[in-house]
A protein has these predicted regions:
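PP2C/PPM-type serine/threonine phosphatase catalytic domain
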Residues: 1-176
Length: 176
């Protein structure tokens, strides 16, 4: 997990929801016919509000409360057949559930206590990994279930990146 805090002038404010422009799209690529990747773009209020996802079951909650955090997750299924898609779907659903359920911790979190928050994200990733392994062992023909996971969590003015596997993320600063 990596945490960044931008050196911001004091006049810079937290962006409003309508000032955040994001988009997600998945594609099967050139090798496989089936798409094994999934994504989620959401904001965390008192509950998670899904803005866009490749998974239709992750419906949005619409409440007009102050945004606590912004979440973007990509799960890139590994391997052929159904196992990669199922692994990426399961990982994305599980990690978003953990993050969404923990939204209340943002109200009580100490702004200077990043270590506790990092440990919580790491624990969530490990729980998803363990659950995916258990699921893989329990389902015949799914022993090779695997996925990468890249998670961005913006809690103004900090960002947290959780990287599991070999998928890349690109960090731009000052347009570069």
């Amino acid at each position: 997990i990596r945490e960044e805090q931008a050196a911001l002038p004091s006049a810079v404010r937290k962006p409003r929801d309508d000032e955040i422009d994001v988009f997600g799209l998945t594609h099967p690529g050139k090798v496989r016919d089936e798409n094994q990747d999934n994504f989620l773009i959401a904001s965390l209020h008192r509950q998670m509000r899904v803005h866009l996802s490749s998974l239709p079951a992750l419906g949005g909650v619409t409440r007009d409360t102050d945004r606590l955090a912004f979440l973007a997750v990509v799960a890139d299924g590994v391997g052929g057949g159904f196992a990669g898609e199922e692994a990426s779907r399961f990982a994305l659903e599980s990690i978003s559930q953990y993050v969404g359920d923990s939204a209340q911790c943002f109200y009580t979190a100490d702004a200077g206590d990043d270590e506790t928050f990092r440990r919580t994200l790491e624990a969530a990733a490990l729980r998803v990994h363990e659950e995916l392994n258990s699921r893989s062992e329990a389902l015949p023909g799914r022993r090779e279930m695997a996925t990468t996971l890249t998670l961005f969590l913006g809690v103004w003015p900090r960002i947290y990146l959780l990287q599991v596997g070999d998928s890349r993320y690109y960090f731009m600063r000052d347009g570069i």
